[in-house]
């Protein structure tokens, strides 16, 4: 059974002043007592909330082997396109009533339900990419466990440890949207979360969609990953030829076939290519 939680913390004492929780069975708790909160949550195996990994779990000190689902980390992955989810503004929940942890718990429940719907609307290949990138992380692993998702792989493949062909897997979903010769294996190994968030934005197909500020604060390498995927030309693939080639851009945006030459030097072309 899952329980949705939220806490109000006194900024001076750094202690919980108010606990709110709502269980899957409909039971609701609003209390100042940690003992009451612990007893209420103990009947569940999964704990969910918004930003509970970096906030609520630190103050509640829950004891037990709970599966943790944090709707904060899921939101940029599953709602990358404008308009963003109505319940989320940057890293905060949009709530109707301030300082009401029960209300916030209910909002977290609603958000998780919408995130599950959004997950089910992804293509099977995109689901597989996100899962293989993120299932081993604390931020996302609990979500996959809760929805009982695992990427299909044969028993023989698991036994012999077949390695994922990341270039093939990603390009199957994002062909024409990223450089075909990007170092996917390196990105997967060093920046799995950053890569997932980058692919979410790329897959949104909306040039005005942006990565939330809190993501950039916590995962600043997202900028570097995006540059490696979309703004670093290999000079030898369809994406780079169409999107990053200076002559193609000149023709597409201005209708000219060649850059002007000044004293035998293509200064305009050099300026574009060095930008």
What feature does the model see in each segment?
Residues 186-255:
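Interdomain "pre-motor" coupling segment immediately N-terminal to P-loop NTPase/helicase cores
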Residues 3, 15-17:
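Short beta-strand micro-motifs in enzyme catalytic cores
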Residues 87-183, 190, 194, 266:
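Acidic, Mg2+-coordinating catalytic module of metal-dependent nucleases/exonucleases
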Residues 242-275:
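Conserved pre-motif I regulatory segment
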Residues 13, 20-119:
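Conserved DEDDh/DEDDy metal-dependent 3′-5′ exonuclease domain
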Residues 1-10:
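Two-metal-ion RNase H-like nuclease active-site motif
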């Amino acid at each position: 059974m899952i329980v949705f939680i939220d806490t109000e913390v006194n900024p001076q004492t750094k202690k919980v002043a108010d606990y709110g929780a709502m269980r899957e069975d409909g039971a609701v708790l609003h209390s100042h007592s940690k003992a009451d909160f612990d007893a209420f949550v103990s009947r569940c195996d999964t704990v969910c909330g918004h930003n509970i990994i970096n906030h609520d779990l630190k103050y509640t000190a829950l004891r037990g082997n709970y599966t943790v689902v944090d709707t904060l980390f899921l939101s940029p992955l599953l709602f990358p396109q404008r308009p963003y989810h109505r319940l989320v503004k940057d890293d905060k929940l949009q709530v109707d009533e301030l300082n009401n942890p029960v209300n916030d718990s209910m909002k977290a429940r609603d958000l998780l339900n919408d995130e599950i719907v959004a997950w089910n609307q992804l293509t099977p290949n995109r689901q597989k990419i996100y899962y293989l990138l993120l299932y081993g992380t604390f931020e996302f692993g609990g979500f996959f466990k809760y929805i009982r998702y695992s990427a299909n792989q044969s028993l023989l493949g698991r036994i012999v440890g077949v390695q994922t062909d990341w270039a093939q897997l990603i390009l199957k979903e994002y062909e024409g949207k990223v450089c075909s010769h990007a170092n996917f294996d390196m990105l997967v190994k060093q920046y799995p979360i950053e890569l997932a968030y980058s692919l979410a934005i790329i897959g949104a197909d909306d040039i005005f969609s942006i990565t939330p500020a809190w993501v950039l604060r916590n995962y600043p390498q997202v900028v570097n990953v995006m540059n490696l995927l979309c703004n670093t030309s290999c000079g030898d693939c369809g994406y780079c030829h169409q999107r990053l080639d200076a002559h193609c851009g000149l023709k597409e945006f201005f209708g000219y076939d060649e850059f002007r030459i000044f004293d035998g030097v293509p200064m305009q072309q050099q300026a574009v290519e060095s930008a």
